Amino acid sequence: MTGCPANLPLTHAPGQQHDTPFQAVVVEAHHCHQPQAFYAQLRQQGLTAIHFIPQLAAGDAALWAEFLCAVFHRWVREDIGRINILLFSETLSAWCGETLTQPGAPAANSTCYGCPWLRLCRCGEQEDPLCAGYRQFYDFSGPYMRVMRDLRRQQRPPEALMPLLR
């Protein structure tokens, strides 16, 4: 069922301290038009570990970016430490210097080597059709990720950022 969590135990985010499996949540174009409402629905359902899976057309990179940035905007102000979103956790881990590549994953292709966000993505043999959307998300989330990385370096939890944004 799209737009609803699938009861699929997925991987745990780097540094995740509990055993809550990620819930796969399929994101379609209509969810991208109301990202705040969709995220509020997931919160209301009590999800605490989410893996967004885009089910979008190749030309929908801007929609994907809009969705990710809107959800991140709310999450960074209200839900750090309460709701674990896999993409956000992996992005923060990359900002903290952790390697995100999985064993056996294909190497980045030559079109990706010049990308300033290569260290954050898991591109494979070909560029993701939603790559522009991910890049826009990385641009948007970068300043917040930088602060959360610095908080971790100071032995403080990333959620210490939330009061600063209110």
Could you tell me what each predicted segment is?
Residues 104-166:
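Flexible mid-to-C-terminal extensions adjoining Fe-S/redox cofactors in radical SAM and related proteins
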Residues 2-103, 107:
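Radical SAM enzyme [4Fe-4S]-AdoMet core and its adjacent flexible, acidic
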